[in-house]
Curated annotation (Swiss-Prot):
Lipid metabolism keyword on record: no
Origin superkingdom: Bacteria
Entry keywords, A to Z: Signal
UniProt protein name: UPF0412 protein YaaI
Source organism of the structure: Escherichia coli O127:H6 (strain E2348/69 / EPEC)
Pfam family, one: DUF2541
Signal sequence coordinates: 1-23
Family membership: Belongs to the UPF0412 family.
InterPro entries named in the record: UPF0412_YaaI
Length: 134
């Protein structure tokens, strides 16, 4: 009897943890190494086109200076959206959520995200991590 109760409790806890993990749909979409010189063609291509409603940016190994970002959607006319991003991200910092797909058409999927910017205050290249929420 005691083992039945233990197994039941374990299953219940596992089910709660499972459902909690599914509720958080945040995924690392990719990481870009940012060069030390200003570059305007840094692209994160998503191998599988996915619906992404918002993104967060974070950095490691140095500070970043960003001058622009755009999202490209898989569509017949290659639609895109310019993102409103912070101009600087310090090492270890994560931005607030940046909304995308805000044009009443939440069915479009993201095929690529491009960035313009460079590493500052570091001899190593900083890494820009892109986190998506669908």
């Amino acid at each position: 009897m005691k083992s039945v109760i233990t197994i039941s409790a374990s299953l219940a806890i596992s089910l709660m943890l499972c459902c909690t993990a599914q509720a958080n749909d945040h995924k690392i979409l990719g990481v870009i190494a940012m060069p030390r010189n200003e570059t305007n063609d840094l692209a994160l291509k998503l191998p599988v086109c996915r619906i992404v409603k918002r993104i967060q940016l974070s950095t490691d190994h140095g500070d970043l200076q960003l001058s622009g970002a755009s999202v490209y959607f898989k569509a017949t006319r290659s639609a895109s959206q310019t993102l409103n991003i912070p101009s600087e991200i310090k090492e270890g910092q994560t931005t607030d959520w940046i909304n995308i797909n805000s044009d009443n058409d939440n069915k479009r999927c993201v095929s690529k995200i491009t960035f313009s910017g460079h590493t500052v205050n570091s001899s190593d290249m900083a890494t820009l991590k892109i986190i998506g929420d669908d």
